[in-house]
Amino acid sequence: MRLAVAYSTGDPAGRGAGRALARLLSAEPTSCPGAVECFKAGYLTIAGFPVEAVRLEMLDEAPDPQASAVIVLSKHRAESGRKSLTVHHPGNPTEDNSLGGRPMELAVAYPALAKALLISLAKASRETGLAESYEVTLEATHHGPTTPSKPVVFAELGSTEEDWRNPLGWETLALAVEEAIKTLPQIERECIPAAGFGGTHYVPKHTRLQLESGYCIGHTIPRYAFDRGVTAEVLKNAILKSYPGPARVALVEKKSLKSPQRRMVEEASEEAGAKVEYI
């Protein structure tokens, strides 16, 4: 499988991790569409772009039109300042598209790749010593880009300027990407693709399942999206917009959603052909 890694050259976390990955893989400098720096290692293209990561809407064509999926390396920002290594899919479950993408549009998820990245981040953080101070977690689906037709998964380092410029953080992301690419084929063969509903932004129950169960989780639609008017169509797309096929299970955090909200998920899941499992 051909994969691509993209980052913003204006983002110290993404740029640092992307260049660390190129060094780790002994990637050769090359040129690729739209990028200001580009490296090639076998079937993997690693490229930096002069735009924000949340606005990389050109990923179908760049950096590798033949890539099946794209991993975006990026900084993570949180007002709490919590040190974290996160994985999530892009998409705007509600009308709010202030951070790129189209309103009420989800990108294509890749549950197996997200699982491979999260497991690999946990492993890499232990190897680099960051596990003691950094939390490895999924995030709910949020921000752009939303228009690429190929799947996009974000792997992020946060949450302060100090963290974004931490070389150990860059190394951790780079090691995780290398490991995820190696383990992806087996994970994809064995895992059950799912979508998540409910929970907070950091979806702790879904994170635990991603790390420890046979499920691989793509889009996660948090409780606050329901409170802000998520539509039935978006809920259905959280299941359907998944590579290589729709999610087979909707994992619903029961206590975090009100009864009408749970019914919305049940109806959307039935229409999309997914089984509902409460967690």
UniProtKB/Swiss-Prot annotation:
EC number: 3.1.1.96
Family matches, as InterPro entries: Deacylase_DtdA_archaea, DtdA
Stretch list, region Disordered: 81-100
GO biological process terms held by the UniProt record: D-amino acid catabolic process
Uppermost EC category: hydrolase
Keywords of the record: Hydrolase, Metal-binding, Zinc
Gene3D superfamilies assigned to the protein according to its UniProt record, in alphabetical order: AF0625-like
Reaction(s) this enzyme catalyzes, per UniProt: a D-aminoacyl-tRNA + H2O = a tRNA + a D-alpha-amino acid + H(+); glycyl-tRNA(Ala) + H2O = tRNA(Ala) + glycine + H(+)
Cofactor note: Binds 2 Zn(2+) ions per subunit.
Listed GO MF terms: D-aminoacyl-tRNA deacylase activity; zinc ion binding
Pfam families from the UniProt entry: tRNA_deacylase
Named cofactor requirement(s): Zn(2+)
Subunit structure: Monomer.
Role, per record: D-aminoacyl-tRNA deacylase with broad substrate specificity. By recycling D-aminoacyl-tRNA to D-amino acids and free tRNA molecules, this enzyme counteracts the toxicity associated with the formation of D-aminoacyl-tRNA entities in vivo.
Family: Belongs to the DtdA deacylase family.
Protein name: D-aminoacyl-tRNA deacylase
Species per Swiss-Prot/TrEMBL record: Aeropyrum pernix (strain ATCC 700893 / DSM 11879 / JCM 9820 / NBRC 100138 / K1)
Organism lineage: Archaea, Thermoproteota, Thermoprotei, Desulfurococcales, Desulfurococcaceae
